[in-house]
Structures are given as C-alpha cells and as structure tokens.
C-alpha cells in the first residue's frame, strides 16, 4: 500500500546524499573540521556543540559519541552539548532564546576550543550568536548548515553545507552521516 511512498522517500534521501557527495569541497570541509577538532583535543581543548530541535539532538549525539565511544573503545574526548535544561530555561527567560548558546560559550569556552553549531537553514539566531561569542573567545568554529547556508554562510571557520532546499529532515540525514565521519576521522587523528 505504501511501497511507492517508501521507495520515493529513500530515493530522495539518496539523491540528496549523492548531490552532497558530488562536490569535492564538501569532502575537504569534513576533513578540515575533523582535523580542527582533533588539534583542539591534542592541546587539551574541547568542543561545544549546539543546535535547535532535531539539530539539538544531533549536537547531543555528537558530544555523546565523543565522550563515550563511536565504534571502537578508546579514551573519551572532551565534547559538551549545550543542553542543560536549567541553563537553557534560565537564559531564555532572563535574556531571550537567541542567547541560550552564546552565554554558555562565554562562560565555558576558551581559546583553542571549537564550537560545532548545527542549523539546517543557517539562520538560527542563537547559533549565529554562539559563533560570534566563540570567535570573540578565540575559539575555532564549525557550522553544519543546509540550503544556501543562510546567514551563517561564510561566518564559521569551516562550513559544511548540504545544498537541499526541501524539508529539513533530508539535511539532518546528511548531517548525522557527516557527524559520524568526523568522529571516525578524529579517532584516526588521535591514534
């Protein structure tokens, strides 16, 4: 009954991934992001990750696989998702939702750390402010975006953009693949 719908959804997902794969710049940016994070870890730095909605879940997943493990046992890496409910609700209430990530970056981020921000539109105000706060602290910045990169286009040190203009879930599907590859490359860099 739904077999055509299922095939169409999987075909569209594959098409989005194949379009992303066809641009060598995307592959180079993934490698650059992994090397940037590994270099920070080698200098006792950390990565702070943030996003909204499904991207927030991806930011937490990224941090969890850094501190826990990806595929193989290895020492944990300093990955922190900006996801503490008391922090998020306090800052949202007292300063506004646009500041939930930047306030954390200002408090916890240090020169040499990395901010890893996810926004499928590239227009999330709170991620933009987090990138600005990270740069002010001397941190490196990585943005996972979609569509045309939105306001984040060209703002981060490394931007990895999924150029899909349909629903955000297709962008998120590629983002999670990128996250897993970045972790795999970090592990190789840290050997």
Curated annotation (Swiss-Prot):
Membrane-spanning regions, if any?
A: none
Query: How is its cofactor bound, per UniProt?
Result: Binds 1 zinc ion per subunit.
UniProt keyword annotations, A-Z: Carbohydrate metabolism, Cytoplasm, Isomerase, Lipopolysaccharide biosynthesis, Metal-binding, Zinc
UniProt-recorded name of the protein: Phosphoheptose isomerase
Q: What job does the chain carry out?
A: Catalyzes the isomerization of sedoheptulose 7-phosphate in D-glycero-D-manno-heptose 7-phosphate.
Q: Which pathway does it serve?
A: Carbohydrate biosynthesis; D-glycero-D-manno-heptose 7-phosphate biosynthesis; D-glycero-alpha-D-manno-heptose 7-phosphate and D-glycero-beta-D-manno-heptose 7-phosphate from sedoheptulose 7-phosphate: step 1/1; Bacterial outer membrane biogenesis; LPS core biosynthesis
Binding residues annotated for Zn(2+), in chain numbering? 61, 65, 172, 180
Q: Which residues form the SIS domain?
A: 37-191
Q: Which Pfam families match?
A: SIS_2
Q: Carries keyword Endoplasmic reticulum?
A: no
| One of the GO biological process terms | D-glycero-D-manno-heptose 7-phosphate biosynthetic process
Entries under SUPFAM superfamilies matching the protein: SIS domain
Predominant place of localization: cytoplasm
What is said about its interaction partners and assembly?
A: Homotetramer.
Q: Which family does it belong to?
A: Belongs to the SIS family. GmhA subfamily.
Spell out the GO cellular component terms annotated for this protein, sorted alphabetically and separated by semicolons: cytoplasm
């Amino acid at each position: 009954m739904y077999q055509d719908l299922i095939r169409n959804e999987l075909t569209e997902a594959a098409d989005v991934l194949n379009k992303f794969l066809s641009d060598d710049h995307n592959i180079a940016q993934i490698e650059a992001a992994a090397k940037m994070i590994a270099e920070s870890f080698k200098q006792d730095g950390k990565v702070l990750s943030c996003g909204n909605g499904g991207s927030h879940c991806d930011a937490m997943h990224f941090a969890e696989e850094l501190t826990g493990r990806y595929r193989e046992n290895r020492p944990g890496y300093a990955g922190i998702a900006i996801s503490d409910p008391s922090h998020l609700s306090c800052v949202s209430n007292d300063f506004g939702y646009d500041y939930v990530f930047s306030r954390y970056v200002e408090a916890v981020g240090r020169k040499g750390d990395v901010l890893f921000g996810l926004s499928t539109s590239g227009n999330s105000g709170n991620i933009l402010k987090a990138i600005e706060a990270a740069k002010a602290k001397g941190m490196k910045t990585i943005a996972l975006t979609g569509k045309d990169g939105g306001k984040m286009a060209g703002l981060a040190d490394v931007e990895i953009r999924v150029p899909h203009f349909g629903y955000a879930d297709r962008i998120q599907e590629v983002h999670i693949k990128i996250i897993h590859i970045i972790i795999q490359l970090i592990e190789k860099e840290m050997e």
